[in-house]
Amino acid sequence: MFNWVKTAMLMAAITALFIVIGGMIGGSRGMTIALLFALGMNFFSYWFSDKMVLRMYNAQEVDENTAPQFYRMVRELATRANLPMPRVYLINEDAPNAFATGRNPEHAAVAATTGILRVLSEREMRGVMAHELAHVKHRDILISTITATMAGAISAIANFAMFFGGRDENGRPVNPIAGIAVALLAPIAGALIQMAISRAREFEADRGGAQISGDPQALASALDKIHRYAAGIPFQAAEAHPATAQMMIMNPLHGGGLQNLFSTHPATEERIARLMEMARTGRFD
């Protein structure tokens, strides 16, 4: 129930951002158009954003015949987590990473890059996929997918405001400085929403994944290895669609400054430390 409340609050917050930007571009008429657009985006995000994200990454669905070891691993972990079997996808990318998407556990999908399958041991890979299934079990996947879709739309509209300006309800041009301010601040506001939701969610998925696999040390080892390998291997699809970065088990974006400040993932060192403490104590609370 709490996740539904969070989802509703997220949609309301992003809708408010759309309305503010619409007001800057076109006054009261722009606000009305932005509201209608936001409602349409909310509907689209709920029903279709998972398909759109998988298409962005050119993810290919696999089964027991095309990727038998990986598919059986996901099925075994889903059974341990008491979850329906999700659809399973592979992404032809060297960068090691993985994510889950979908609107609920009955319509979930998990995806991993070919790079992560090469880099990690089977034990470490179990830890990663258990983490992704924890997102499914906690019903995080709808929130993360909606956030990714809406944040991308906010950035696009904000750029439109900066380059094309806007007019008030009387047709007069708005202050160009205000338009630039909206273009700069709206994506930051969207990033803050993503960050606030995503960081706590990653810790919970680490904990939940450790419970599902029964092996927190394996996930800790996987995170360390992904962190080291990913630093030197660009993830082209993620760089092209940065709003989806918060869906990944590890931040796939390269860069510093504001990008690090607004990172949607907690520090890898802290995640590893928490997992190692779970391994030491045998407690997952």
UniProtKB/Swiss-Prot annotation:
InterPro entries in alphabetical order: HtpX_protease, Pept_M48_protease_HtpX, Peptidase_M48
Family matches, as Pfam families: Peptidase_M48
Cofactor note: Binds 1 zinc ion per subunit.
Assigned keywords, A-Z: Cell inner membrane, Cell membrane, Hydrolase, Membrane, Metal-binding, Metalloprotease, Protease, Transmembrane, Transmembrane helix, Zinc
Lineage: superkingdom: Bacteria
Intracellular or extracellular location(s): Cell inner membrane
Membrane topology: Multi-pass membrane protein
GO terms for cellular component: plasma membrane
Cofactor: Zn(2+)
Residues binding Zn(2+): H131, H135, E202
Entry's family note: Belongs to the peptidase M48B family.
Name recorded for this polypeptide: Protease HtpX homolog
Gene name as annotated: htpX
